[in-house]
């Protein structure tokens, strides 16, 4: 298999697994009555530990970033505002609605990123980016109102946390670029997850005594942490390195689609026509932004 096909396959598998992880998280919270805060803590702690361990075995100098005061502070900010917030707001959105809706709303983050950079740099976006912003707004409108501006099809809390999740994902994507360039992806992301989980530990650790642990829940935990987080992250990184960011972004659109289909098949959650139209419009905005990035790269 050629490197391009292998990269595309890795990203596609990662996207499907990421979509399934949201469904898995919803299953865990529904079956155990576990709070989104406790599940976030467990997910971050174990996934972070796995990634840091894997990074160490890979030969990375995992403690270098902690020895530089400025970079350690930047890592702490990323841990709180990035890793912790993006996971917590995502699970809160699932708690208030469902995995499919949470995944689609979080996919607004690319539009937020390009809009922010256009404002910060005072540059006029190209036609592809402007179209992407417009389609994402229309898609969000359809998803949350079903075309009726006088009412919401999801709760106001779900909408709030979903939009917050998109902003957190935008920060998560852009903030650590300098740290990753200097120290590598696995140490930065692994430590950020670990620190994010540790921050929640004093407040939510006691919740572990409030629910019974069954075999199915343990299996779901394993899938969420090992398959849906650690393995998925590694597959996506490897695939993105082989095919480039723009192509990876387009293929990652399989994530919300897999989440919606698995929610339908496994959890009995159905999407109406406005839901599907809104989802497709938001996904098309990601594709347009990726195409614009590819065009700019060729022109440079």
Curated annotation (Swiss-Prot):
Alphabetic keyword roster: Cell inner membrane, Cell membrane, Membrane, Repeat, Transmembrane, Transmembrane helix, Transport
Cytoplasmic membrane side: 29-45, 93-99, 146-151, 206-216, 285-300
GO cellular component, one term: plasma membrane
Topology of the protein relative to the lipid bilayer: Multi-pass membrane protein
Record-annotated membrane-spanning stretches: 8-28, 46-66, 72-92, 100-120, 125-145, 152-172, 185-205, 217-237, 264-284
Pfam family, one: EamA
Protein origin, superkingdom: Bacteria
Subcellular compartments: Cell inner membrane
Database matches in InterPro entries: AA-Vitamin_Transporters (IPR050638), EamA_dom (IPR000620)
The EamA domain, residue ranges: 16-145, 167-291
Disulfide bonds: none
Stretches of the chain found on the membrane's Periplasmic side: 1-7, 67-71, 121-124, 173-184, 238-263
Family in the record: Belongs to the EamA transporter family.
Identification of the protein by name: Uncharacterized inner membrane transporter YicL
